[in-house]
């Protein structure tokens, strides 16, 4: 399939019962029926499984990790090899996280500023700088079907003031991630709602990301566990 033949990226609600719903994501590399479980291929490989074995489980999308692929083998090399999907032999859609969760989990090895995050590689201690723009660029180089906005993964527990400051930083980073994103037919970018366990902060976050509240019923939602 050439890029001119790819269907546009989109989402439709197929059925709804109260707050529960069943939907379908359409991408240039296949559909994903939601709710969906994403096998994790951290470093462009789902451990102990070949791509056809992953597909045989019914999985329609794989998640790969920007942080780990940035460190090894590096986004430039992955791009030269045709992207993560080609590298691992996976024909379906691919979602990459922004690298934010892993960077935030480094604790004393990282330093957060308005610009982004500076951190030491857990492999050899080399210094790296990850910004919303760089995270978005790397995910483009990895050829992610779904790119995630760069965010600060708020620690738990957090006070209200800590959660608000973290959420507001993530929303500023989200705007920069959006500006850096290169739109392509069949690809999409997701924002990430922050605000910890505080409902009003989460609604503020939604407003920042979508300019409407609550989340529209015809938009996809991705949930990942909070850091502890």
Model segments located where?
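Non-catalytic, usually N-terminal nucleic-acid engagement modules in DNA/RNA processing proteins
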Residues: 2-183
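Conserved hydrophobic/aromatic pocket- or pore-lining residues that grip, position, or stack substrates
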Residues: 139, 191, 209
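Short, small-residue-enriched loops and turns at beta-alpha junctions
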Residues: 155-156, 195-200
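Distinct, well-ordered alpha-helical segments
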Residues: 199-208
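Hydrophobic alpha-helical segments, chiefly the membrane-spanning helices
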Residues: 210, 223-228
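Conserved small/polar residues in nucleotide/adenosyl-binding loops
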Residues: 211-220
């Amino acid at each position: 399939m050439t890029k001119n033949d790819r269907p546009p990226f989109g989402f439709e609600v197929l059925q709804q019962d109260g707050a529960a719903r069943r939907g379908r994501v359409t991408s240039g590399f296949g559909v994903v029926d939601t709710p969906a479980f994403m096998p994790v291929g951290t470093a462009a490989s789902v451990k102990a499984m070949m791509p056809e074995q992953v597909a045989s489980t019914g999985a329609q999308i794989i998640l790969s990790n920007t942080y780990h692929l940035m460190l090894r083998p590096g986004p430039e090399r992955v791009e030269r090899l045709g992207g993560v999907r080609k590298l691992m032999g996976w024909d379906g859609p691919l979602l990459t996280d922004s690298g934010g969760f892993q960077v935030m989990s480094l604790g004393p090895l990282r330093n957060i500023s308005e610009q982004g995050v500076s951190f030491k590689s857990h492999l050899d201690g080399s210094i790296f700088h990850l910004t919303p723009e760089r995270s978005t660029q790397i995910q483009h180089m990895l050829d992610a079907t779904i790119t995630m906005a760069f965010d600060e993964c708020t620690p738990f527990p957090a006070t209200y003031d800590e959660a608000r400051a973290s959420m507001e930083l993530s929303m500023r980073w989200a705007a920069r991630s959006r500006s850096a994103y290169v739109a392509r037919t069949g690809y999409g970018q997701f924002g990430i709602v922050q605000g910890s366990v505080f409902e009003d902060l989460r609604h503020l976050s939604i407003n920042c990301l979508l300019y409407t509240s609550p989340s529209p019923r015809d938009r996809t939602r991705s949930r990942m566990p909070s850091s502890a």
